[in-house]
Each structure stands twice: as structure tokens, then as C-alpha cells.
From Swiss-Prot:
Intracellular or extracellular location(s): Secreted
Organism: Caenorhabditis briggsae
An example Gene Ontology biological process: neuropeptide signaling pathway
Protein name: FMRFamide-like neuropeptides 27
Keywords (A to Z) from UniProt: Amidation, Cleavage on pair of basic residues, Neuropeptide, Secreted, Signal
Region forming the signal peptide: 1-24
Disulfide bonds: none
Length: 90
């Protein structure tokens, strides 16, 4: 029969083996998932607005007004160090 210490040692070995064969992959391996971007065209914005309206959305032409509390990306980079942008796999 196993003593408690032998059982504990066995469980630690099993856990260590499971951790060494983990299925977690680093970010850069396997196939990264990229977001698809549409090509810019002369009528791309208008077509997008019309599609949105046809699907029950509201039409928004022009730039949205921003509130004074909005912070631009340049200001965020200045505040948080301005390092390179890191992409995260989804």
C-alpha cells in the first residue's frame, strides 16, 4: 500500500509531467489570426453606410464629434511609454 508521502511524490511527478506536455502555445507559433481589412475605394464609405442603413442601422456621414474627455492615440502613447504595438493572437 502507498504511504501518504509516496502518494504525494507520485502526484507531484504526474503534475510536473502534465505541465511539461502542456498544449498551450506561445503567441508566435501556429497560425496567427489576423483581422481582415477592406480595401479603400472611392465609394467604400458610402457603400458601407448604405449597407448599414439597409440592415437596420442608422446612416452616419462625416466625422463623429468627440467629447473633451476623449484621448487621442498620440496622447496615450505619450502617457504609457510609446513602445511598439504588440499584436495578440485571438
Amino acid at each position: 500500500m502507498f504511504s501518504f508521502r509516496k502518494f504525494l511524490a507520485f502526484m507531484l511527478i504526474v503534475i510536473a509531467l502534465m505541465a511539461s506536455f502542456s498544449s498551450a502555445q506561445p503567441i508566435d507559433e501556429e497560425r496567427p489570426i489576423f483581422m481582415e481589412r477592406r480595401e479603400a475605394s472611392a465609394f467604400g464609405d458610402i457603400i458601407g453606410e448604405l449597407k448599414g442603413k439597409g440592415l437596420g442601422g442608422r446612416m452616419r456621414f462625416g466625422k463623429r464629434s468627440s467629447s473633451p474627455s476623449d484621448i487621442s492615440m498620440a496622447e496615450l502613447r505619450a502617457i504609457y511609454g510609446g513602445g511598439p504595438v504588440e499584436y495578440v493572437q485571438l
